[in-house]
Amino acid sequence: MRAPCKRSGEKEEQEEGVAAAAGRLAGAPEAEECSDVDSDSDREMEGIHGPGGLVKDTVYLRSCQAHSGVPASCFLRQVSTPELNLRHHGLGPQGARALASPLTSNPYVKRLDLRDNGLCGAGVEALAGALSKSSTICDVDLSENQMGVVGVQAICAALTVNLTMQKVQLAGNSLEEHAAQYLAELLLAHTGLKSLDLSYNQLTDHAGEILGPALAENTGLTELNISWNHLRGPGAVAFARGLEANIFLRVLDISYNGFGDPGASAVGEALKTNNVLEELNMSNNRISAVGALSLGLGLRVNQTLRILVMSRNPMRGEGCFGVLKSVRDNPMSALELLDFSEIQVDREFDDLASSVKVLLPALHVKTAAHRVEYRKELLPVFTPSLPASVPK
C-alpha cells in the first residue's frame, strides 16, 4: 500500500536525478530499462522520437527541474506514442506537476494511464489543468491515487470543459459522499463521456441520492462501473430510479454494494421501462428471495437485457427459480446469460431451466452446480482509436 500523500523527498537528490537525465539526453543516451510492473505496456524507443522529439524531452526535463521532480524514463520513450503508460511509477504530486506542462501541448497521446502513482489531490489538480486543455487525450486512468475531494473536484471541472474525453477511471480513490456532487455535475455536463469507472470507492447511500437524478438526466454515458461501494437503502433506490429514466446506459455494474430487497425492487421497476440496458451485474447485494421476485417483475417485460449476474446473493434456490420463471414468461426476452454462481438450486430449478432452454435456446444459465461457457460479444461501448501496431 502506498504511503499517505506528502510532499516530495530531499530536493538535492531529486535535482541530481534531473541533472543526470538532462545530461543523458544531451549525449544521446543508451535507453534505460523501464522498471514498471506492467513493463509490457511500455514502448522501448531508441534515440529521438522523430521531428520535435528533442524539444518535447527538453520541455519535460525543464518541467521536472522546475518542480523538483525526478524524470520518468518511460515518459521519454512514450511521449510520441498514442498510449502513455506510467502506472505504478510512484510519481507523486511533484511528478504530476512536471508532467502537466508537456502533456498540455502533446499532439500524440490519446490514452493516459497513471494508475497507482500517489498523485494525491495536489497532483491530480495539476494534471487537471493539462487535461482541460488537451485536444487529443480521450482515455485517462487515475485510479488508486488518493485524490480525495480536492482531486475529484479538479478533475471533474477539467473534464466538464474537455469534450474530447470519452473514458475515465477513478477506481480506488476512497471517494466519499462529498465527491458525489462533483461527479453528478460531470454526468450532467459532459455528453461525450462514454465510460466511467467509480469502483472500489466509499460512495454511500447519500451519494446514491445525488448520483441517481444525475444518471436520469445524463445523455451520453454507455458504461458505468460503481461496484464495491456502499450504496444501500434510500440511496440504492434513488440510483435505481435514475436508471429507470436513463436512455443511454448499456452496461451497468453495481455488484458488491448493499441494494438489498428495496434496491432490487427498484431495479425491477426500472427494467420495466428501460429499453436500452444490455448488461447488469448485481452480485453480492444482500438480495433475498423476496427481492429476486420483485426484480423478476421487470424481467417479465424487458426486451433488451442480455446479461444478468446475480451471484453471491442470499436468494437461495427459491429466488433463482422466481427470476428464471419470469424470464420464461417473457417470449420477447433477449437474455443470453443468467449467472447464479455460488447459489445452490434444487431439482425443480433444473427442470425449469431445461424447459426454458427449449423456449430460449440462446440462454445460458449458470449456478453453483452448473458451470457454463458463455463468450459474450463485446459491446462497442468504447474502442480507443489506436493504430494497429499499438497493443490494446
Locations of the language-model features?
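Leucine-rich tandem repeat or coiled-coil scaffolds
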Residues: M1-K392
